[in-house]
């Protein structure tokens, strides 16, 4: 009996040591998380309470939007406190459903500002989260990348990309340091140009990322919305080409996964979102942990397609699914 008890203690200690050398990460494009205030420096006119949308100026600006869905959002979406709070609650529920208390480090895309990020943080704080980080970028729409972490975040930086083409995109790469078990890890949060823009802009963005990691020897993780469609990936072998520098999450192992985003137009799945771990820096995936995070409230059971947030029913989370993984120090 005593021997069995000692064995159990040793097993628990061994597991604790293993856990101490690992961390979990999540990346999620939250699909337009805005507050309810009108920020004159940002294009947030679609995400305002309906009573703020009655002016002639607002209607004229909305009618200039070419995409019907976005134009209707601008004109008719009632983004009030109740709707905003429902979106926050659903996001928090989605995040916490992973491992019952969320990943250690979360990279988020499409966050308007620190104010709304802090509201989400307050919902997550009881689950061990202690720090957040967001730097306001020059993005024309006013959506930024952000981190929420169970470890302290330091040295936040934005790296803007100079594109070879004439097209301009203002979303930078967001870099932070996070110290875990006395080791600094560089995290890079990405939201690359959308598929509206040519593929060379996403390739330029990856080139900038790869130059950044050459400037230091820290373990590095890059995660976020790469906006690389399955069509472009197949044609240009983009993710495969990154394996010179990185372990690419969904290429390492995600056998039962379809992708993180579903294109209804051509009925295809894509890994717009993924996680990269830099090679040869004593950090690697636990391959069996790599997954696209699905729950009954963030995706349809049969098809697996994401359930976007519906401001009428207040159901759903995002048009993207999160990718998650567990990482381990060598």
What kind of region is each of these model predictions?
Residues 44, 106, 134, 164, ...:
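Extracytoplasmic, non-cytosolic globular domains
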Residues 30-34, 111-115, 137-141, 152-154, ...:
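Solvent-exposed loop/turn segments at secondary-structure junctions
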Residues 74-84, 101-108, 134-135, 164, ...:
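Second-shell loop/turn segments in exported
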Residues 18-123, 137:
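N-terminal, active-site-proximal structural segment of metallo-dependent hydrolase catalytic domains
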Residues 24, 211-221, 228-330:
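Metal-dependent phosphoester-hydrolase catalytic domains
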Residues 87, 91, 113-116, 144, ...:
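Stable alpha-helical elements in mature extracytoplasmic
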Residues 105-184:
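Structured beta-strand-rich core segments of catalytic domains in phosphoester-bond hydrolases
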Residues 1-20:
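Classical Sec-dependent N-terminal signal peptides that target proteins to the secretory pathway
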């Amino acid at each position: 009996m005593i021997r069995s008890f000692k064995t159990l203690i040793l097993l628990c200690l061994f597991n604790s040591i293993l856990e101490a050398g690992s961390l979990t990460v999540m990346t999620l494009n939250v699909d337009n998380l805005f507050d309810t205030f009108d920020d004159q420096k940002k294009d947030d006119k679609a995400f305002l309470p309906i009573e703020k949308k009655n002016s002639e100026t607002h209607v004229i600006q909305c009618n200039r939007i070419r995409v019907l869905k976005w134009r209707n959002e601008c004109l008719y979406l009632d983004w009030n406190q109740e709707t905003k709070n429902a979106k926050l609650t659903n996001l928090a529920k989605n995040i916490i459903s992973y491992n019952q208390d969320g990943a250690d480090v979360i990279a988020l895309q499409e966050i308007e500002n620190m104010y709304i990020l802090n509201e989400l943080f307050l919902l997550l704080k009881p689950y061990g989260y202690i720090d957040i980080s967001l730097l306001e970028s020059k993005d024309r729409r006013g959506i930024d990348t952000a981190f929420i972490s169970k470890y302290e975040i330091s040295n936040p930086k934005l790296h803007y990309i100079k594109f070879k083409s004439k097209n301009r995109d203002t979303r930078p790469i967001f870099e932070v340091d996070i110290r875990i078990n006395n080791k600094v890890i560089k995290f890079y949060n990405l939201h690359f140009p959308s598929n509206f823009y040519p593929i060379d802009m996403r390739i330029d963005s990856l080139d900038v990322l790869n130059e950044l990691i050459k400037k230091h020897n820290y373990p590095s993780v890059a995660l976020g919305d790469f906006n690389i469609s399955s069509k472009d990936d197949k044609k240009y072998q983009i993710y495969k080409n990154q394996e010179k520098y990185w372990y690419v999450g969904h290429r390492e192992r995600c056998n039962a996964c379809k992708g993180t985003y579903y294109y209804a137009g051509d009925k295809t799945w894509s890994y717009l979102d993924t996680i990269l771990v830099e090679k040869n820096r004593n950090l690697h995936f636990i391959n069996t942990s790599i997954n696209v995070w699905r729950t009954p409230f963030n995706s349809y059971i049969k098809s697996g397609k994401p359930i976007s947030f519906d401001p009428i029913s207040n159901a759903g989370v995002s048009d993207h699914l999160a990718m998650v993984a567990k990482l381990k120090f060598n």
